């Protein structure tokens, strides 16, 4: 199982996670081949896993040049189902897998038990697409509407309580999270947008540049469209690695 505590020296690319948000295994395989020397981890989400299943995991193992694998299924179900699913995920040889922190405590405990020390469980706190209005519409009170970070920290505390490897949160909450839970508690951050360049149909609300996320203490930066949409995806990934390198100095 991957642990930040065991990583003595990390290259800039080791912080970069490419989101394989594509519809087919063949297209994903092309990106794995293209980016294996430019990113340290590949993220497999719901659409690709539903379409490709275990094949995409095997593809990354075979062609990813040693890159890590983040299976982002955001499990949320009754405890027994989550336990059995996480146990099956652990057998695939992935490095991280996600579960929603908004679930009951027994579900969180089941996720950690099912992982059996073979995969790092990450708690999804609040989606980076959520705004204050979304939090209000979900039925939360003023305490969380006025400060989404409070809801993130509440859910991060649940993840820490049950021994998760870390959480998924916006770059804006990383600094406070590290201060409270320590540097060894992994922070995986979506909502990353390069200092230069826009993306189409941007549905993220709580965002940051790669450099700022690193300075805040993020351990992994999840990037999809800013790498996928340019004509030269490898160059786009290299440019983000350059931003990471500058922030690490």
UniProtKB/Swiss-Prot annotation:
Q: Which domain of life is it from?
A: Bacteria
Task: Quickly give the catalysed reaction.
Answer: orotidine 5'-phosphate + H(+) = UMP + CO2
- Catalytic residues, per the record, are 74 (proton donor)
| GO MF annotation list | orotidine-5'-phosphate decarboxylase activity
What processes does the entry annotate via GO biological process terms? 'de novo' pyrimidine nucleobase biosynthetic process; 'de novo' UMP biosynthetic process
| Entry annotated with the keyword Acyltransferase | no
Q: Which controlled-vocabulary keywords does the entry list?
A: Decarboxylase, Lyase, Pyrimidine biosynthesis
Q: Where does substrate bind?
A: 21, 43, 72-81, 128, 193, 204, 224-225
Q: Which Pfam family, any one, appears in the UniProt record?
A: OMPdecase
The entry assigns this protein to a family as follows:
Belongs to the OMP decarboxylase family. Type 1 subfamily.
Q: Which HAMAP family does this chain map to? A: OMPdecase_type1_B
What is this protein's record name? Orotidine 5'-phosphate decarboxylase
What lineage does UniProt assign to this protein's organism? Bacteria, Pseudomonadati, Thermodesulfobacteriota, Desulfobacteria, Desulfobacterales
The gene name reads pyrF
């Amino acid at each position: 199982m991957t642990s930040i505590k065991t990583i003595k020296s990390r290259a800039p690319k080791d912080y970069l996670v490419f989101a394989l948000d594509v519809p087919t295994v063949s297209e994903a395989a092309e990106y794995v081949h293209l980016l294996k020397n430019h990113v340290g981890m590949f993220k497999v989400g719901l659409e690709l896993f539903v379409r490709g299943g275990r094949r995409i995991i095997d593809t990354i193992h075979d062609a990813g040049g040693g890159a890590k694998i983040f299976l982002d299924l955001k499990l949320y179900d009754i405890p027994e189902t989550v336990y059995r699913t996480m146990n099956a995920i652990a057998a695939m040889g992935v490095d991280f897998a996600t579960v929603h922190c908004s679930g009951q405590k027994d579900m969180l405990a089941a996720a950690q038990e099912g992982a059996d020390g073979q995969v790092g469980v990450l708690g999804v706190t609040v989606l980076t697409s959520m705004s204050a209005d979304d939090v209000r519409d979900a039925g939360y009170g003023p305490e969380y509407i006025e400060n989404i970070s409070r809801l993130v920290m509440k859910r991060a505390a649940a993840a820490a309580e049950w021994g998760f490897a870390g959480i998924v949160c916006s770059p804006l909450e990383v600094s406070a999270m590290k201060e409270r839970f320590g540097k060894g508690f992994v922070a995986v951050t979506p909502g990353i947008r390069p200092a230069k360049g826009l993306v189409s149909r941007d549905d993220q609300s709580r965002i940051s540049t790669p450099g700022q996320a690193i300075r805040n203490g993020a351990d992994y930066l999840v990037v999809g469209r800013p790498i996928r949409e340019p004509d030269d995806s490898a160059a786009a990934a290299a440019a983000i690695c350059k931003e990471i390198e500058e922030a690490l100095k």
